[in-house]
Design a protein with these regions (language model features):
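Conserved N-terminal beta1-alpha1 strand-loop-helix module at the mouth
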Residues: 1-47
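N-terminal amphipathic alpha-helix/helix-capping segment at the start of soluble metabolic enzymes
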Residues: 1-16, 23, 139-149, 300-307
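Active-site-adjacent beta->alpha loops and helix N-cap segments on the catalytic face
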Residues: 3-6, 26-28, 53-65, 84-90, ...
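Short, acidic/polar
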Residues: 24-37, 59, 85-92, 164-175, ...
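Active-site pocket-lining/capping segments in soluble small-molecule metabolic enzymes
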Residues: 122-145, 153-162, 204-259, 264, ...
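Active-site mouth loops of central-metabolism enzymes
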Residues: 13-29, 74-86, 150-168, 245-260
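Catalytic cores of alpha/beta
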Residues: 83-96, 168-172, 197-203, 220-226, ...
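Conserved, mostly hydrophobic/aromatic
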Residues: 17, 45, 95, 176, ...
Length: 307
């Protein structure tokens, strides 16, 4: 089912992100997490794609396994970096064959320590180019669904790390939507005002597709530093930093504060009519399950009944 159809039928949506594990032990842990979170009936789940396509097969295998062995609707990430048109066409054909309905099209991170890599030589310079290529694939009839793949793209409430000019940033996002994107899923943020401002600027720019908010609960002090790296410099509000500092070296307290803060974010987002919330789980279920409990719901469908 296309995500834009899900958003029409199930708003507000709740969904989860996983990343492909690289060891057998991590795989077993992830499948346990997936089993625990499947009971919460997410609208969809996404699966990340490593820098420079480094997890191409791992991502594919996880997506296909989720598709075949669970009731979940997987959405694979796909990036521009280090891919030829032939590479992307092959990846899309394999996902179409597996019955995958959606793709999240991203610019992607450059590969680390790859000698001689020149970004200018990539077939897809921007995510909008990748969106346009997927749209062309759809029009070629390569998918059992006559509409082809549903297409999502990323948004950055705190600003894109490589595009400090907010006007140009919004032009790039508009280009992705004009190329065929159905919805936007945002990078994580910790100040909801950043999201509301981003959403308002999108509407002013003529971007009217649904916008899903990305939320990642803090579960450890060290995890905060890692989050900032993953999000290319996430901004932590002073009130959150003060709450974390009061915990000192008590990691259990840090986790409780982080989950409470994320829950308050979710409640506020829901009160402000958010289209959906996407939880960055880091392949763990505890924080997400605690947020559901604090929201007073046992699964995603219960949230829609209460809305």
């Amino acid at each position: 089912m296309h995500i834009d159809d899900i958003l029409k039928d199930q708003k507000p949506t709740l969904s989860f992100e996983f990343f492909p594990p690289k060891t057998s032990e991590a795989s077993e842990a992830l499948y346990t997490t997936i089993g625990e979170l499947e009971a919460y009936k997410p609208s969809f789940v996404s699966v990340t794609y490593g820098a420079g396509g480094s997890t191409r097969e791992l991502t594919h295998d996880l997506v296909v396994r989720i598709k075949k062995t669970t009731t979940l609707d997987p959405v694979p990430h796909l990036t521009c970096v280090c891919h030829s048109e032939g590479d992307v066409a092959s990846i899309l054909a394999r996902y179409a064959e597996a019955g995958v309905s959606n793709i999240l099209a991203l610019g992607g991170d450059p590969p680390k320590n790859l000698a001689g890599y020149d970004r200018a030589k990539d077939a897809f310079q921007h995510a909008a180019d990748l969106v346009a290529f997927i749209k062309k694939f759809n029009e070629g009839g390569g998918h059992a669904d006559k509409r082809g793949f549903g297409i999502g793209v990323a948004g950055f409430p705190e600003g894109h790390p490589t595009t400090p000019n907010r006007v140009i940033e919004m032009e790039h996002l508009k280009a992705k939507v004009d190329a065929g994107a159905d919805y936007i899923c945002t990078q994580l943020f910790f100040d909801n005002h950043d999201f509301y401002d981003f959403r308002a600027r999108c509407r002013l720019a003529g971007i009217h597709v649904p916008i899903i908010a990305g939320i990642m609960p803090i579960t450890s002090a060290s995890g905060m530093r890692r989050m900032a790296e993953l999000a290319a410099g996430a901004r932590y509000p002073a009130k959150l930093l003060r709450a974390i500092q009061r915990c000192g070296n008590d990691e259990d307290a840090v986790q409780k504060v982080g989950i409470h803060y994320a829950t308050e974010q979710c409640l506020d987002l829901l009160d402000h009519g958010v289209d959906g919330i996407h939880f960055y789980t880091l392949n763990k279920s505890h924080a997400t399950r605690e947020i559901y409990a604090s929201l007073g719901i046992h699964d995603s469908a219960a949230l829609r009944k209460a809305s």
